[in-house]
Amino acid sequence: MAGTVIEYLKKYGDIPFCEKPLNDVDSLALCQLSYLKFDGMVSDVRHNGPSVTLQEIAKRPDVEQLFGDVRFEKENRALFEGLLSGRRFRNMKLNCYINLVEKEWETQFSAITFILDDGTLFLAFRGTDETIVGWKEDFNMAFLNPVPGQEYSVKYVNMVTGWLHQPFYIGGHSKGGNLAVYSAMKCAPFVRKRIQKIYSLDGPGFRPEVLKECHYNAIEDKVVKLLPHSSMIGMIFERDIHYRVVESKNHGLLQHDPFSWLVKDDHFVDVGDIYESQKIMNEALNEWILSLNEEQVRTFVDTLYQVISASQADDLITFTADWKKSMNAVVTALKEVDDQTAEMLRGIIRSLFEIARCKVKEELIATKKTRHRFKNTKRAGKAEEVRPDPAASPDATVTQGSAARHAPKLRGNHRQGRPGRS
């Protein structure tokens, strides 16, 4: 029966990396671990201090600080305890931590380096945390290139690998996955050669021009992109067909939570592809964003941030703690938006619904055509039986299918061609 990353740790947590190399599920555990609040516990990347093990952190009197994000407190606590319980992660070393939240630059950036027992490194970028500034930076990716967090990620990789010279993995969940891919594209060429794999766990992609400018094709063979069945975040600006889809025990947007991803033995439960209905929605969203000019996107994002900031909450925890107060502030702020901006917002939203409507219509037409072709094929199949030749023996009466089975095989220098190849 399939479980989650927590069950994986119970089963394989005692096998060291020198016996069982890092796999996709390990990457999820480490990327999620980067969400914990290691401030003051792990050496800052700017100070080049000593490393510390998980065991040493667990013994600190302020260990409860790790679970400051109450949204995932229960899951993060189970993850931490699961990592501590076995040899695989217990003595893993942590170093080069950084956590920046800069309101004036509209950026939230956090990263940490894990040193595994086989000597390899895993550089993990935190995804969007509970800060409202962090969510604003996510939206900024729609029109800014690069956003400050992406620039920081490149500096981080070059700095850490300048001190630690081992081969390394790099990864992140959500925005962290975007930062992992971006930093791999833009880091120094001699550093890039040491990258083993790049993990993007339901991380958003990039505008087409960014992929071209940053030479994504130079690293694409090392990218492991994992998406849940109903992925939306990870399909933003997605132009890379090389992704894998994993099953989740949650539904809809809640599948973005990596603790919901299903694991069997030491691997994820893979499924065929994103749900078709979700694909249509994702295509509409991407087409909509790319159809807007920079001024429209900037106005939309800035107004949204301005309205939410009117609640005076610094993070989502505070925003939702007094939901009524926050929403009253939002409604008041919306009323104060000037007429010109309000009209632009209405036009932007109308265009989203129009594109979505067209996408659904196109899909319905395509479905009808497919069904029509299928019916015609079935009718044609029945008519294709070869009629008996009066001059031939009764035993010679065959259908096309049986004729193919009895056809002589090519021998000598001839080879049978494979379907779909010329």
In which residue ranges do the predicted regions lie?
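Catalytic cysteine-centered active loop of the rhodanese-like fold, especially the PTP/DSP P-loop
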Residues: 167-169, 182
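Short glycine-enriched nucleophile-adjacent loop
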Residues: 180-189
